[in-house]
Amino acid sequence: MKLHEYQAKEVFADAGIPTPESALATSVDEAVEVADALDYPVAVKAQVHVGGRGKAGGIKLAENTAEAREAAESILGMDLKGYTVDRVLVEEAVDFTNELYVGVTMDRSEGAPVVMVSERGGVDIESVAEEAPEDIVREHVDPSFGLQAYQARNAVYDAGIEQDVAGDVAKIVQGVYDLWADSDATEVEINPVMVTSERDVVAADAVMKLDEDALFRQPAFADMEEDAAEDDLEAKANEYGFDYVRLDGNTGIIGNGAGLVMTTLDLVDYYGGQPANFLDIGGGAKADRVANALDMVFSDENVDSVVFNIFGGITRGDEVAKGINSALEQFDEIPTPVVVRLAGTNAAEGREILNDDLVTVEETLEGAVQRAVEYADEEDIQ
């Protein structure tokens, strides 16, 4: 579960990590009211889960009331990379002299948490990692002991952070790690940490991703789950209990098991397509659950074809087939072509049940993916 910036900054503030003064607004008048209560200039920032908000027009600076109103009117309701902006964070703009990067995640190759610090903040850190990996200092942490103060200081000094702010940056590094560990997060990131003209340090942005499977022991985040959902599709996925990730492509993908779905995503890409989503219906899925999954994928207007990849173990092929038929029979006209690959338990029975007038059945996964990609390409041409 990824928190919005405003949610992450609330968590940061509670953890003692300095952030600019800010407040959330859901209307133009409310945004202006917040801006007037702060010290100008202010930044008006779209609250959507996309990168590059500034370049896409989702972040604007305002020097006065009129500009704050103009910025809010421009951002609220805009379509930002496929997402409608329905709320903005209004915060005091920071007069900065330098931008840094601080982040914590799990390094799976080392089997340990890793703290990352860089002087090159304010830019895409993935690009820095590719072009100049030496510019990112990495400090691995023994989770049995947690991040020690000397490790935080070493990371900051090794990154070349200016000495007069190094101590404050080290405190932020320590705070970010402690927050990552205490909240069962998969990633906590500040990009950038801004060094102000008065030589203070503040978290000008905030990224926080939580392990959804650990939310049962994180009651403090329970109230944030619904608001953290980006749109109706994510909210619907939460309601149905699906593991769902929306992507930027046009080939919808439904499978039973994370590994199977990931394999299907890779094959869609291999055959020249673009995955529209990750959707795992889980093991033992009954007909109604399959129907819900298909209805959800159809709800994404970017989807031009759908591929089912089902390998029956606990999940029976005949139950999946009934669910597909049930979902498709609700439509006077099928929104997009549907391709199905069934294998495993009761797969033969499932293929017999499937309505050939509604779906295309393929024997192999490769054949199913290629057919789905072809259908998506045809829809694009039309």
From Swiss-Prot:
Mg(2+) binds at residues 191, 205. One of its GO terms (cellular component) is succinate-CoA ligase complex. Binds 1 Mg(2+) ion per subunit. GO terms for molecular function: ATP binding; magnesium ion binding; succinate-CoA ligase (ADP-forming) activity; succinate-CoA ligase (GDP-forming) activity. Its EC number is 6.2.1.5. GO terms for biological process: succinyl-CoA metabolic process; tricarboxylic acid cycle. Pathway: Carbohydrate metabolism; tricarboxylic acid cycle; succinate from succinyl-CoA (ligase route): step 1/1. Disulfide bonds: none annotated. The keyword Cell membrane does not apply. Its cofactor is Mg(2+). It catalyses: succinate + ATP + CoA = succinyl-CoA + ADP + phosphate; GTP + succinate + CoA = succinyl-CoA + GDP + phosphate. ATP binds at residues 45, 52-54, 91, 94, 99. SUPFAM superfamilies: Glutathione synthetase ATP-binding domain-like (SSF56059), Succinyl-CoA synthetase domains (SSF52210). Keywords: ATP-binding, Ligase, Magnesium, Metal-binding, Nucleotide-binding, Tricarboxylic acid cycle. Succinyl-CoA synthetase functions in the citric acid cycle (TCA), coupling the hydrolysis of succinyl-CoA to the synthesis of either ATP or GTP and thus represents the only step of substrate-level phosphorylation in the TCA. The beta subunit provides nucleotide specificity of the enzyme and binds the substrate succinate, while the binding sites for coenzyme A and phosphate are found in the alpha subunit. Heterotetramer of two alpha and two beta subunits. Belongs to the succinate/malate CoA ligase beta subunit family. This is Succinate--CoA ligase [ADP-forming] subunit beta. The gene is sucC.
